[in-house]
Amino acid sequence: MVKAVFAGSFDPPTFGHLNVIERAQKIFTEVHVVIAVNNNKNYLFSGEERKHMMEELTQKWDNVFVNTWNSLIVNYAEKIGANVLIRGVRNVSDFSYEFDLAVMNKGLNQKIETVFMVPDTKYFVLRSSSIKELASFGGNLSGMVPPIVEKALKEKIEEI
């Protein structure tokens, strides 16, 4: 039984995130999607809002679990008995950043392995920050985020 953890801010969740989750859940016995909650960061959506969206989006997979976490991801992995961290990489700059994190995580816990997953190429340009900016200008988000996320983005932007 191999448990894996896929952590991120998911602010908001995108089709790229879901593509990685869908593929990971076919490889690993369990995939734990962990919503990062860092009080020093400014998120558009609260941790609970992001968790709720991700739960809705992943409910079709019985082996995918969603939680929030506000500490080191290796500690979460150890807590649930996972030994794999999944990291999505779209390009060389993503890989460079994620490689450094993988080395650091390995230093924190020798049992942790990092698996890099490349999303389908049609999702390479998706960045949550760009999607939020596009939404703020009323841009078309179809093909970037699921309808429930698009609706939540529009509602959140109207509040601001």
UniProtKB/Swiss-Prot annotation:
<feature type="binding site">
    <location>
        <position position="73"/>
    </location>
    <ligand>
        <name>substrate</name>
    </ligand>
</feature>
<keyword id="KW-0963">Cytoplasm</keyword>
<protein>
    <recommendedName>
        <fullName>Phosphopantetheine adenylyltransferase</fullName>
        <ecNumber>2.7.7.3</ecNumber>
    </recommendedName>
</protein>
<feature type="binding site">
    <location>
        <begin position="9"/>
        <end position="10"/>
    </location>
    <ligand>
        <name>ATP</name>
    </ligand>
</feature>
<keyword id="KW-0460">Magnesium</keyword>
<dbReference type="InterPro" id="IPR004821">
    <property type="entry name" value="Cyt_trans-like"/>
</dbReference>
<feature type="site" description="Transition state stabilizer">
    <location>
        <position position="17"/>
    </location>
</feature>
<dbReference type="GO" id="GO:0005524">
    <property type="term" value="F:ATP binding"/>
</dbReference>
<feature type="binding site">
    <location>
        <position position="17"/>
    </location>
    <ligand>
        <name>ATP</name>
    </ligand>
</feature>
<dbReference type="GO" id="GO:0015937">
    <property type="term" value="P:coenzyme A biosynthetic process"/>
</dbReference>
<feature type="binding site">
    <location>
        <position position="87"/>
    </location>
    <ligand>
        <name>substrate</name>
    </ligand>
</feature>
<dbReference type="Pfam" id="PF01467">
    <property type="entry name" value="CTP_transf_like"/>
</dbReference>
<feature type="binding site">
    <location>
        <position position="9"/>
    </location>
    <ligand>
        <name>substrate</name>
    </ligand>
</feature>
<dbReference type="InterPro" id="IPR001980">
    <property type="entry name" value="PPAT"/>
</dbReference>
<keyword id="KW-0548">Nucleotidyltransferase</keyword>
<keyword id="KW-0808">Transferase</keyword>
<dbReference type="InterPro" id="IPR014729">
    <property type="entry name" value="Rossmann-like_a/b/a_fold"/>
</dbReference>
<dbReference type="GO" id="GO:0005737">
    <property type="term" value="C:cytoplasm"/>
</dbReference>
<comment type="subunit">
    <text>Homohexamer.</text>
</comment>
<comment type="pathway">
    <text>Cofactor biosynthesis; coenzyme A biosynthesis; CoA from (R)-pantothenate: step 4/5.</text>
</comment>
<keyword id="KW-0547">Nucleotide-binding</keyword>
<feature type="binding site">
    <location>
        <begin position="123"/>
        <end position="129"/>
    </location>
    <ligand>
        <name>ATP</name>
    </ligand>
</feature>
<comment type="similarity">
    <text>Belongs to the bacterial CoaD family.</text>
</comment>
<feature type="binding site">
    <location>
        <position position="41"/>
    </location>
    <ligand>
        <name>substrate</name>
    </ligand>
</feature>
<dbReference type="GO" id="GO:0004595">
    <property type="term" value="F:pantetheine-phosphate adenylyltransferase activity"/>
</dbReference>
<keyword id="KW-0067">ATP-binding</keyword>
<keyword id="KW-0173">Coenzyme A biosynthesis</keyword>
<comment type="function">
    <text>Reversibly transfers an adenylyl group from ATP to 4'-phosphopantetheine, yielding dephospho-CoA (dPCoA) and pyrophosphate.</text>
</comment>
<feature type="binding site">
    <location>
        <position position="98"/>
    </location>
    <ligand>
        <name>ATP</name>
    </ligand>
</feature>
<feature type="binding site">
    <location>
        <begin position="88"/>
        <end position="90"/>
    </location>
    <ligand>
        <name>ATP</name>
    </ligand>
</feature>
